[in-house]
Structure formats: structure tokens, C-alpha cells
Amino acid sequence: MMPAKLQLDVLRTLQSSARHGTQTLKNSNFLERFHKDRIVFCLPFFPALFFVPVQKVLQHLCLRFTQVAPYFIIQLFDLPSRHAENLAPLLASCRIQYTNCFSSSSNGQVPSIISLYLRVDLSPFYAKIFQISYRVPMIWLDVFQVFFVFLIISQHSLHS
């Protein structure tokens, strides 16, 4: 079991990371419920691509999580591939696993937690399961998704 002081340190790190532009943990019991198994960081595709300084956040977290590695399996979901490739050595050195739930379906290994919800409907997964709130309102994510779908359709119709 992880020492209480280390738990507190990790919680402070998470709160500090939230100020760097990633998620804010609302539920202080998060570590109590997950400390025997894993900590999961969810970076939905659109916020990670447009709003979150992913590299800065991960470097900040990795500095702290080297000492936590024996106690946690740290997983990142939905990290855009370009960030994962650039940060592969950093992630490996801290035993951080990277899972992209969109590409994982190709080999049939969909993460069990994510499979509880439809993988395209990100809002209930991120908002309810982990009680995480993002600084970017969810409505903006919907606007971006609609915009990109419209863009793809319009490009397709132009070529046909």
C-alpha cells in the first residue's frame, strides 16, 4: 500500500497539473479508490489537439511519478499519436503506458473501462466515471466535432 505522505504528494501534483491546462479532479477520494490498481489520465482527442499543452503537462507529471511507479500503473488514454511518439522515451522511463482507444479497437484490445461506454461519446465517460471537469466547456468539443464532420463531407462532395 502506498504511504499516506506519497498519496498526498500525488494529489498535489494532480492539482498542480490541472493549473497547467489539463483536467481538475473534483473527487478527493479518487486516489483512495484507485491506488491499488491504476491512475488513468484521460486526454480526449480534441482538447489534447487544440487546448492542452500535453508535453508540458507530461513532463511535469513524470518528474513526480518516477517514485510512484511501484505503486501505480499509470495509463494515458486518447493521447494524439504525435505526442506519444515524441514522448515515448519519457513515458517509458516512468513506466507510463499509452493507450489510444481509437486505434486499440483494431487489434481487439479495447480498454475495459472505456468499453463501459460508447467510445465515441466521450462526455459521459470523462465527466461521470472519473468526475473530471475540463476548463474547456464540453459544448465547444461538440462544435469542433460538427465542424470537422462538415469539413470532411464538404471536401468529399467537392471531389465527387
From Swiss-Prot:
Describe its membrane topology.
Multi-pass membrane protein
User: Taxonomically, which superkingdom?
Assistant: Eukaryota
Listed A to Z, the keywords are:
Membrane, Transmembrane, Transmembrane helix
Question: What residue ranges are annotated as transmembrane?
Answer: 39-59, 136-156
What are the annotated GO cellular component locations? membrane
Give its localization. Answer: Membrane
Q: What is its main location?
A: membrane
Further comment found in the protein's record:
Completely overlaps YBL113C.
The similarity annotation says: Belongs to the UPF0479 family.
Q: Can you say what this protein is called?
A: Putative UPF0479 protein YBL113W-A
Organism field: Saccharomyces cerevisiae (strain ATCC 204508 / S288c) (Baker's yeast)
